[in-house]
Curated annotation (Swiss-Prot):
The complex comprises the extracytoplasmic solute receptor protein TeaA, and the two transmembrane proteins TeaB and TeaC. GO terms for cellular component: plasma membrane. It is found in: Cell inner membrane. It comes from the Bacteria. InterPro entries: DctQ, TRAP_DctQ. It is a multi-pass membrane protein. The chain crosses the membrane at residues 33-55, 65-82, 103-125, 145-167. This is Ectoine TRAP transporter small permease protein TeaB. Disruption phenotype: Deletion abolishes accumulation of ectoine from the medium. It comes from Halomonas elongata (strain ATCC 33173 / DSM 2581 / NBRC 15536 / NCIMB 2198 / 1H9). Part of the tripartite ATP-independent periplasmic (TRAP) transport system TeaABC involved in the uptake of ectoine and hydroxyectoine in response to osmotic upshock. Probably functions as a recovery system for synthesized ectoine that leaks out of the cell. Keywords: Cell inner membrane, Cell membrane, Membrane, Transmembrane, Transmembrane helix, Transport.
Length: 193
């Protein structure tokens, strides 16, 4: 097991007090949701393939279940990516700055991104409520379609919280952090372009 996998398994937030507890709890919840989502999607897809080729019948609900799982994995995954500093960043100007400038810029970036995530959460809640009002249902599974989109505002909320925590971590630390647990820097395996 690599150091990165070991750190992932025993994640502990670098934030103080209740913020660290919340961050660690959200991290564990995200890991469970993502692992279960991927396993369920794989199981569902394999069962459908076996059913189609061995029995000549596809499972009627496979497409809808995989659609639900894709939405769940995507929006649980954005918070996970932010937590582990796995997001896309444009670093030409950022890398040219001294440590203090990088930390200040990371605080601004984190706060702005957090606000954008909360803004998107606000509008996605309205979208889910609109779907609820329309009363649409999934044809194969027969339950209301708004339920599968509840993951969208939850994902934006968790990601917004994570970026807010990153800003707090940078405000309370001497180092520059990409997330609450990832210090800025390049590993030996990464190359600068």
């Amino acid at each position: 097991m690599t150091d990165e996998e070991e750190a992932e398994k025993h994640y502990h937030s670098g934030l103080p007090g209740i913020l660290g507890t919340i961050d660690t709890l959200i991290s564990k919840l995200e890991a469970i949701i993502l692992a279960l989502g991927v396993l369920l999607m794989a199981t569902n897809t394999v069962a459908n393939v076996i059913g189609r080729f061995a029995l000549g019948e596809s499972l009627f609900f496979t497409g809808e279940v995989n659609r639900i799982l894709i939405i769940m994995i995507t929006f649980a995954g954005i918070g996970y990516a932010a937590r582990h500093g796995r997001h896309i960043r444009m670093s030409a100007i950022y890398d040219a700055l001294p440590v203090g400038g990088r930390r200040a810029l990371m605080i601004v970036i984190s706060l702005f991104t957090s606000l954008v995530m909360f803004f998107l959460m606000y509008y996605s809640v309205h979208y889910v409520l609109d779907l609820y009002d329309k009363g649409r249902i999934l044809p194969a599974l027969g339950f209301p379609i708004f339920i599968i989109y509840v993951w969208v505002p939850l994902g934006f909320l968790i990601t917004g919280i994570q970026y807010l925590f990153t800003a707090i971590k940078n405000l309370t630390s001497r180092d520059v952090y990409l997330s609450t647990s990832v210090v800025d820097g390049y590993k030996d395996t990464e190359t600068e372009v």
